[in-house]
Amino acid sequence: MKTIVKNGRVFDGEALTRQDILIEDGLIQAVGLGLDETGCQIIDAQGQIVSPGFVDLHVHLRDPGFAHKETVETGSMAAAAGGFTTICAMPNLNPVPDSPEHLQVSLDRIQEGASVRALPYCSITEGEKGEKLVDFEALAGKCAGFSDDGKGVQQGEMMRQAMIRCAKLDALICAHCEDESLLDGGYIHQGEYASLHGHKGICSASEYEQVRRDAAYALETGCRYHVCHVSAKETLEIVRQAKAAGARVSCEITPHHALLCDMDIAGDEGRFKMNPPLRSAEDRAAIWRALQDGTADAFATDHAPHSAEEKSRGLAGSAMGIVGLETAFPVLYTGLVKKGILSIERLLWMLTYGPSRVLGIPCGVVPGNRADLVFIDENTIDVVDSRRFYSMGKSTPFEGMETQGRVVRTVCQGKTVYREER
């Protein structure tokens, strides 16, 4: 069946223009006006933005191994509801995808249950234990890249050797940067809120010192090196300088780090606990500058669901991580676009073209590409209500936030995988 998307304002990477889109066999066949509608199903996008499907570089599906937190089915449906047609799944699973055999377990679960395209990462070290590097040569090309997310690679020479080998394969290293020797039992940012309320803090140096180390290795080796969930202003300056020096370095920003700071923590609640933590207002201002000047390459949610019990133990005792797939667009549109910090075009670029470039995959509403599309209503007012989430995880710092703009339909490879029910 052929499908034509009509009357939408289509994002082409630079601007929103009135175009129609012909879809057949899961691919975009034509883009333009006056397309032949004979025998076509019609999707009327009047009054809506039509963008390439969003791409999330950083998602925890928790499956296999931790299905009490999330499953491939629930996580990918949350992605669809958020407008994401491609998600990259982190490897802190059981089994960890650290060998072809273990990777196949993840691929089989994705094949069975995913409603959007899910690309798994393999780990950098066996079992994410930081002791022995994986067989990169046996895994490259079968995964999105390599990450020990949830942990930083503590040994510098081990990371350097990983980059040397990945550079030869043109494989991506996606790094959670955290020097464990600097954590000192902290669980929120070492800043004003922690001081006022007697909480143990995590210093920003635990992030940026490891980024400084790795950026030097990236420049030396030529490896594609991506920094996960940047939270500190110093990290952004290191990335900025590394790019200027010619390193193949990129970085991502989460919605919560872009919109919140430590002083937004509203009481001793686990929904404000994530890693890295919400940092200072000064760090948030630096993030805005990085979003505007191109230092930051992509938004990524770091969607990290946990059970209600695991998030009910307050700031000190709760598991680290919040959900983000279903709230990303409305909170970013409300908090950045409506306040004049970013244009709608820049926001869309960082949810589509930016992360696609990091991965090295095609992006754009152009003939020959996958028909992965998100339909957006910019005007509707809503309130974040975790009871409506498809995700099994309900912990969000944006609970109760009034938002403007929402995803109304998601099409993945030509198939509607989400349509709003209201």
Segments predicted by a language model, with ranges:
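Divalent metal-coordination and catalytic microenvironments
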Residues: 8, 21, 26, 47, ...
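Histidine-rich, glycine-flanked metal-binding segment
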Residues: 1-52
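Active-site mouth loops of central-metabolism enzymes
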Residues: 57-70, 93, 119-132, 199-204
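A glycine-rich helix N-cap at a beta->alpha junction
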Residues: 108-124
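Histidine/acidic residue-rich metal-binding segments in metalloenzymes
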Residues: 133-299
